[in-house]
Structure formats: C-alpha cells, structure tokens
Amino acid sequence: MKNPMLEVVSLLLEKLLLISNFTLFSSGAAGEDKGRNSFYETSSFHRGDVLEVPRTHLTHYGIYLGDNRVAHMMPDILLALTDDMGRTQKVVSNKRLILGVIVKVASIRVDTVEDFAYGANILVNHLDESLQKKALLNEEVARRAEKLLGFTPYSLLWNNCEHFVTYCRYGTPISPQSDKFCETVKIIIRDQRSVLASAVLGLASIVCTGLVSYTTLPAIFIPFFLWMAG
C-alpha cells in the first residue's frame, strides 16, 4: 500500500521542479526556427551513442540510432487527446511539452538530430565520464532504445529522458539531475530559517483569515513537519 504522505511529497517535488524549469521550456520557443535551420555534422556519431543537449537548467538526452535519427523521451499532451499519428509525430511544441509534463504523458519517439537538439550544442557519451559507469555495447544500447519506442508514463523525478538513456546505456535507470534537485530541496527543508518562515506565514494567515481549520491546521503542521525533517 502506498504511503499517502510520500505521494504528496513526491507530487510537490515534481511541481517544484516543473516551476523551476519553466523558463527552460518557454525559452525554447524563441529558438525553434534556429533549431530547424541548424545543421549538425553526424559523421562522428555512432549508433548507440548517448547525445546530450545542455539547456539553461536541465539537460535533454537521446540515443543515436544512425541515419540522423535520435530516440528520446518527450512529454506531449496530444498523446492523451488523439491517436492521429500524423499530428503526434510532428515536432513537439513547448506548449505541448509543458502540458504533457503536467498530465504525465510522454512517448519515446524518433526525431532528426536537428529537431532533437533545436540549435543547441551536442555532447556525445558525456555520461560515461560523469557517471563512471561501464556502457553496454552500442548495438545493444540502440536495440534497447528501439524496443521502448512508443507511449510511456512520464515523471520529472522518476521517469524522464535521463532515466531512459541510462537504462539503455548502462542497464539501470538513474537520473542525477533529479537526485540533485531532491538534495537541494532537502537542504532547504533542513534550513531552520525555512521552518521559521513557514511559521511566520502560517501565523499571518491565521491573523488575516481567522481561526478556521483550513488555515490553522497547515499553520501548525507544516512548520512541525519541516522541523521534524530537519
């Protein structure tokens, strides 16, 4: 049986991560034309390579399949609204992506290198060095990616593009980006100033709205749980 408290914490963490990276998604709209007009030299890419595209706050990952094709996980609201492949196979816009993150629907899809990178620089197999893990054979990596093509549930914390490529490349789905974000949240929670600030805000809400259950209980329990977590 799932722990309701853990589910609430998980949901809050995902929403915080989405908000903190909203500028990443929205800033991409200005670079869409640039990405489509960019040309990438793919002769040095090998089938099964991990392609890494650093962004402002997050890094996007994919598996190179050869012939200028990249398999990558993309949230997309259209997947929940239509089965029309002609519409869902078009390049995912930022609005589709953001709404897809919110409703947690995605697909592992194949796009051109240009559509995958959108004008950004591409790093190749950088994870091998940063994670210091032994990679599977490139052909095995590519085959794993191809087997996973299609619809998949999405989670910023537990099932994102980094989980996809690390599973294909190393056999284990991990996401250092998500882990780093969770650690940052833990540090904030453990900071006694956060407890004090939440207590002050809680008291202020009681003063402004009166002693009613929907303000009194959060004002008491939120500082208490933050204090206990610290």
From Swiss-Prot:
It is linked to Leber congenital amaurosis 14: A severe dystrophy of the retina, typically becoming evident in the first years of life. Visual function is usually poor and often accompanied by nystagmus, sluggish or near-absent pupillary responses, photophobia, high hyperopia and keratoconus. Inhibited by all-trans-retinyl alpha-bromoacetate and N-boc-L-biocytinyl-11-aminoundecane chloro-methyl ketone (BACMK). Residues 1-194 are cytoplasmic. The keyword Transmembrane helix applies. This is Lecithin retinol acyltransferase. The chain crosses the membrane at residues 195-215. Its main location: endoplasmic reticulum. It comes from the Eukaryota. It comes from Homo sapiens. GO terms for biological process: cellular response to leukemia inhibitory factor; lipid storage; positive regulation of lipid transport; response to bacterium; response to retinoic acid; response to vitamin A; retinoid metabolic process; retinol metabolic process. One of its GO terms (molecular function) is retinoic acid binding. Pathway: Cofactor metabolism; retinol metabolism. The lineage of its organism: Eukaryota, Metazoa, Chordata, Craniata, Vertebrata.
